[in-house]
């Protein structure tokens, strides 16, 4: 029935409201016509390609955000390191032009490691442990060479004396120069670790497992008692003895068993065992370990150097090898000179042995 207009009296048909409310079923009524073409509104649909691109962008954004947080954390952590810059000129560090030229293209990085027991902030301390850490990417190895601290060498400006005196005289720069000049090395970086907190780091790792002879056990227990160290005695000897932090430090500092060469060997054993234990701990413990080590360390290495070496060491599956100087091939002897005991040996022969070990010059490779 047609509805009547109350003002004009005309009648008109009532529109179909239900169909008008559905804009798509009445699309012809709302379509825009231009010439002979009719354009209709329709929903936009994303293509599969566009969805993939958007998803990848979101994932990339999340990765970049996480990477930024991790990078900021690492930078903040590395800021705990004490920094001591070294001269950039190789000759200033005692590196000869011949040595620099010979090894410039080899992917082997040598870093001096100094262990000191300095309990005061202004105390440089003698290098109680002196080692060369070699990052050998050519043969995928980490090599650790310890040099006896009583080695008789020439120290620039001070004459002939013990090699560990160089660190006490003028710090790491002179110590590195002394190693380079006496062993034809090309060391341009160093890390110094304060041994005063070494026991705490080992305890954080859960202790270490190490070979201990019966003589070493007896001497260590005597030192524990004499020095009043608050720890349990070492109860057994053998190929794998579990040591706490204090026990391990006493073990490494034992000067009464086998002389200085065996003492440096014990120091290498402790460091090697710490390295193995550090790889075995849960990843959630790494931040605490890193904080403990860095807070007791000083270095000349940049953040990029540290990150590069650390990443390679963890991911490369590199094996660790060790050597000490002097050894049975160096014609070494203990001598008293001007009332002081020194390790005297053929430095030229020792240099050849050191280079063969680090660079594997005489290997089949």
Each predicted region: which residue ranges?
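N-terminal targeting leaders characterized by basic, low-complexity, disordered sequences
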Residues: 1-42
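Entry/capping segment at the start of metal-dependent catalytic domains
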Residues: 2, 7, 43-139, 308-310, ...
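Extracytoplasmic
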Residues: 106-109, 125-130, 137-147, 158, ...
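Soluble non-cytosolic domains of exported or imported proteins
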Residues: 123-127, 157, 166-174, 192-196, ...
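Amphipathic, coiled-coil-like alpha-helical scaffolding segments used for oligomerization/assembly
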Residues: 165-232, 302
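Flexible, polar/acidic helix-loop-strand segments at domain edges
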Residues: 203-282, 364
């Amino acid at each position: 029935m047609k509805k009547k207009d109350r003002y004009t009296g005309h009648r008109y048909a009532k529109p179909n409201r239900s169909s008008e409310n559905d804009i798509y079923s009445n699309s012809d009524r709302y379509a825009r016509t231009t010439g002979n073409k009719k354009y209709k509104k329709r929903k936009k649909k994303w293509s599969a390609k566009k969805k993939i691109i958007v998803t990848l962008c979101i994932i990339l954004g999340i990765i970049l955000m996480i990477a930024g947080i991790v990078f900021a954390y690492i930078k903040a952590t590395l800021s705990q390191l004490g920094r001591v810059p070294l001269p950039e000129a190789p000759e200033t560090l005692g590196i000869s032009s011949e040595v620099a030229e010979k090894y410039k293209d080899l992917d082997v990085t040598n870093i001096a490691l100094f262990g000191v027991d300095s309990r005061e902030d202004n105390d440089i301390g003698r290098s109680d442990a002196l080692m060369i850490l070699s990052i050998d990417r050519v043969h995928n190895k980490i090599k650790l060479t310890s040099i006896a601290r009583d080695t008789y060498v020439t120290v620039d400006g001070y004459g002939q004396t013990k090699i560990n005196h160089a660190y006490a005289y003028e710090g790491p720069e002179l110590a590195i120069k002394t190693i380079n000049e006496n062993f034809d090395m090309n060391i341009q970086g160093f890390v110094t670790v304060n041994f005063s907190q070494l026991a705490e780091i080992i305890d954080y790792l859960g202790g270490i497992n190490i070979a201990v002879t019966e003589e070493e056990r007896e001497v260590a227990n005597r030192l524990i008692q004499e020095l009043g160290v608050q720890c349990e005695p070492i109860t057994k000897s053998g190929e794998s003895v579990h040591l706490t932090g204090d026990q391990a430090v006493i073990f490494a500092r034992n000067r009464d068993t086998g002389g200085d060469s065996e003492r440096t060997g014990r120091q290498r054993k402790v460091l090697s065992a710490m390295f193995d234990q550090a790889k075995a701990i849960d990843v959630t413990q790494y931040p605490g370990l890193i904080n403990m080590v860095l807070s007791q360390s000083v270095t000349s290495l940049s953040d990029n150097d540290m990150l590069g070496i650390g990443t390679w060491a963890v991911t490369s599956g590199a094996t660790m090898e060790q050597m000490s100087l002097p050894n049975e091939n160096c014609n070494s002897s203990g001598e008293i000179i001007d009332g002081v005991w020194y390790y005297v040996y053929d430095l030229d022969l020792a240099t050849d042995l050191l280079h063969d070990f680090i660079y594997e010059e005489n290997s089949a490779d």
